[in-house]
């Protein structure tokens, strides 16, 4: 707990320092400044959604490196200065980027407009495992609500709309351009939604076991059941009692696949799979991209299609 509050004080101090050194006037639109729109985004989905809207009309920065787990990441003074200098700062929610509310309160006039991409989306509560872990004070960051809304193609559309609205407000001269890009990308997300919906209807099984509670919104949208090994943060480990229940559940439901994510340790998933005679496969949370994915030029929609193909092994989808 002391470490958590110490971190928040450091963040607050950094923002105050940057604010004191920066321009105290309120930021204007991109055109009034005479340069391109500058948007800073926190982690990969926020970057992807924003880039699809802005394209060549602005510069979009990714704050958290794609190879870094974003749940417990905190900004450096350099990161804070980058946010301070931007026109817009796009983040998923205070339940994912838990440092954002403190940072925003600490900033003076002239900072970027903060854009909560999940604004207006009904968030689900965290898992029982998550609450149990935090009751014992074992984790510094609280995810009382599930922040993983971007993993539902339907809710991803809402995030794109939220981001678009703020971009248009900041740079109204390019309104038609941004809205055209947004509509085109949303159409692709709608096609992705149809693909998931059609596949889910063909599934013989509905449950799948994941490394952590990241796919609740996706499961709810398509009538599936996510069975998580741990809570909302991938570095959590289940209690012995929870793991024993999972083993029993997996055997009773003839589970053949345990899903894990590439940018977090797969140790627990590997152990469970070994003990029940299952295999492991990647189910990508899109919290960051691997170097291989980046080299291939893969995007949100590509990887969500890969996720669907991986899920077919558990759901026993009829051809």
Curated annotation (Swiss-Prot):
The record's annotation in PROSITE patterns points to: PROKAR_LIPOPROTEIN
Q: Name one GO molecular function term.
A: metal ion binding
Instruction: Tell me which InterPro entries the record gives.
Output: AdhesinB, Bact_metal-bind_prot9, Lipoprotein_PsaA-like, ZnuA-like
The entry's keywords: Cell membrane, Ion transport, Lipoprotein, Membrane, Palmitate, Signal, Transport, Zinc, Zinc transport
Q: What is its main location?
A: membrane
User: Cellular component terms, GO, for this chain's entry?
Assistant: membrane raft; plasma membrane
| Lipid sites, type S-diacylglycerol cysteine | 21
Which N-terminal stretch is annotated as signal sequence? 1-20
Q: Name one Pfam family in it.
A: ZnuA
| Gene3D superfamilies, per the entry | Nitrogenase molybdenum iron protein domain
User: What phenotype is described for loss of this gene?
Assistant: Cells lacking this gene grow slowly in zinc-deficient medium; this effect is suppressed upon addition of exogenous Zn(2+). Growth is slower yet in a double knockout with YciC. Disruption results in low transformability.
Q: Where does Zn(2+) bind?
A: 71, 148, 212, 287
Subcellular locations according to the entry = Cell membrane; Membrane raft
What is its induction? Answer: Repressed by zinc via the metallo-regulatory protein Zur.
Q: Can you supply a Gene Ontology BP term from the record? A: cell adhesion
Membrane topology, from the record:
Lipid-anchor
* Lipid anchor positions (N-palmitoyl cysteine): 21
Family to which this protein belongs:
Belongs to the bacterial solute-binding protein 9 family.
Subunit info here reads: The complex is composed of two ATP-binding proteins (ZnuC), two transmembrane proteins (ZnuB) and a solute-binding protein (ZnuA).
What does this chain do?
Part of the ATP-binding cassette (ABC) transport system ZnuABC involved in zinc import. Binds zinc with high affinity and specificity and delivers it to the membrane permease for translocation into the cytoplasm. ZnuABC-mediated zinc transport is required for comF expression and competence development.
Provide the protein name: High-affinity zinc uptake system protein ZnuA
Q: Which organism's genome codes for this protein?
A: Bacillus subtilis (strain 168)
Q: State which gene encodes it.
A: znuA
């Amino acid at each position: 707990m002391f470490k958590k509050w110490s971190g928040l004080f450091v963040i607050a101090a950094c923002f105050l320092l940057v604010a004191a050194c920066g321009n105290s006037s309120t930021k204007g639109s991109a055109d009034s400044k005479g340069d391109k729109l500058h948007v800073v985004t926190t982690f990969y989905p926020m970057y992807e959604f924003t880039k699809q809207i802005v394209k060549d009309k602005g510069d979009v920065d990714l704050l958290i490196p794609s190879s870094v787990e974003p749940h417990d990441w905190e900004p450096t003074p350099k990161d804070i200065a980058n946010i301070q200098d931007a026109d817009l700062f796009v983040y998923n929610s205070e339940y994912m980027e838990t440092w954002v509310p403190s940072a925003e309160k600490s900033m003076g006039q002239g900072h970027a407009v903060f854009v909560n991409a999940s604004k207006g989306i009904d968030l689900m509560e965290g898992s029982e495992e998550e609450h149990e872990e935090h009751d014992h004070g074992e984790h510094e960051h609280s995810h009382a609500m599930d922040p993983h809304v971007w993993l539902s193609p339907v809710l991803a559309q809402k995030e794109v709309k939220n981001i678009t609205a703020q971009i248009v407000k900041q740079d109204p001269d390019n309104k038609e351009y941004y809205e055209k890009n947004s509509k085109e990308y949303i159409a692709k997300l709608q096609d992705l939604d149809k693909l998931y919906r059609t596949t889910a209807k063909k599934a013989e099984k509905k449950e799948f076991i994941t490394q952590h509670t990241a796919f609740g919104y996706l499961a709810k949208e398509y009538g599936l059941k996510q069975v998580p090994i741990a809570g909302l943060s991938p570095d959590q480990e289940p209690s012995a009692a929870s793991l024993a229940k999972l083993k029993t559940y997996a055997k009773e439901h003839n589970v053949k696949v345990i899903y894990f994510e590439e940018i977090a340790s797969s140790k627990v998933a590997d152990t469970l799979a070994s003990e029940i005679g299952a295999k492991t496969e990647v189910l990508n949370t899109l919290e960051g991209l691997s170097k291989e994915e980046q080299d291939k030029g893969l995007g949100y929609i590509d990887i969500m299609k890969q996720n669907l193909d991986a899920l077919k092994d558990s759901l026993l989808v009829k051809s």
